Amino acid sequence: MAKKALIVKAQRKPKFAVRAYTRCNRCGRPHSVYRKFGLCRLCLREMAHRGELPGVTKSSW
């Protein structure tokens, strides 16, 4: 889990637009965040397996 201070810091608008970065809305993780869902890869995988994300299915080929 991310520290509260880092989550609050990420929510503020930065002085320069290029300094903005995405964080997972669920756990606050800063890396590998899918913009479409606003979740990191770990939370996305967990929620997809539990069926909490509509329209997301496990692919097999």
From Swiss-Prot:
Part of the 30S ribosomal subunit. Contacts proteins S3 and S10. Belongs to the universal ribosomal protein uS14 family. Zinc-binding uS14 subfamily. NCBIfam families: PRK08061.1. Zn(2+) binds at C24, C27, C40, C43. This is Small ribosomal subunit protein uS14. It comes from the Bacteria. Its cofactor is Zn(2+). One of its GO terms (cellular component) is cytoplasm. Keywords: Metal-binding, Ribonucleoprotein, Ribosomal protein, RNA-binding, rRNA-binding, Zinc. GO terms for molecular function: rRNA binding; structural constituent of ribosome; zinc ion binding. Pfam families: Ribosomal_S14. Binds 1 zinc ion per subunit. Binds 16S rRNA, required for the assembly of 30S particles and may also be responsible for determining the conformation of the 16S rRNA at the A site. PROSITE patterns: RIBOSOMAL_S14 (PS00527). GO terms for biological process: translation. SUPFAM superfamilies: Glucocorticoid receptor-like (DNA-binding domain).
